[in-house]
Amino acid sequence: MYQELIRNELTEAAGVLQAFLADEQNLKNIEAAAKLLADSFKQEGKVLSCGNGGSHCDAMHFAEELTGRYRENRPGYAGIAISDPSHLSCVSNDFGYDYVFSRYVEAVGRRGDVLLGISTSGNSGNILKAIEAAHAKGMKVIALTGKDGGKMAGLADVEIRVPHFGYADRIQEVHIKVIHILIQLVEKEMAK
């Protein structure tokens, strides 16, 4: 009854991934981002990750697989998703939602750390403020974006952009694949 819909959804998802894969710059950017992360971990740095909605879940997924594991057993890496409910509700109430991530970066971020900001539109105000705070702290910034990169375009040390202008879930599907590849590459770099 729904097989045609299922086929169309999977075909569209595969097409978005193929278009992303066809741009060699995306592969270079993923490699550069993994190197930034590994360099930070080698210097006892950490990565702070943030996003909204499904991208928030991706930020938590990323941190979990750094501190826990991905495919193989290995030492944990310092990954923190900015997701503490008491922090988020306090800052939202007292300062406004645009500051929920930047206040955390200001408090916890240090020179040599990395911020991973995830926004399918590239226009999330709270991610933009987190990027600004990270730069002020001397942190490196990796951005996972979509569409044309939005306001985040050009603000990160490394931007990995999924140039899809349809539904955000297609962008998120590529983002989670990129996250898994980043962790795999970090593990290889750390094993050197």
Curated annotation (Swiss-Prot):
GO biological process: carbohydrate metabolic process; D-glycero-D-manno-heptose 7-phosphate biosynthetic process
A Gene Ontology molecular function term of the record: D-sedoheptulose 7-phosphate isomerase activity
Its EC number(s): 5.3.1.28
Subcellular location: Cytoplasm
Positions contributing to substrate binding: 52-54, 65, 93-94, 119-121, 124, 172
Keywords (A to Z) from UniProt: Carbohydrate metabolism, Cytoplasm, Isomerase, Metal-binding, Zinc
NCBIfam families tied to this protein: gmhA (TIGR00441), PRK00414.1 (NF001628)
Protein name according to UniProt: Phosphoheptose isomerase
Gene: gmhA
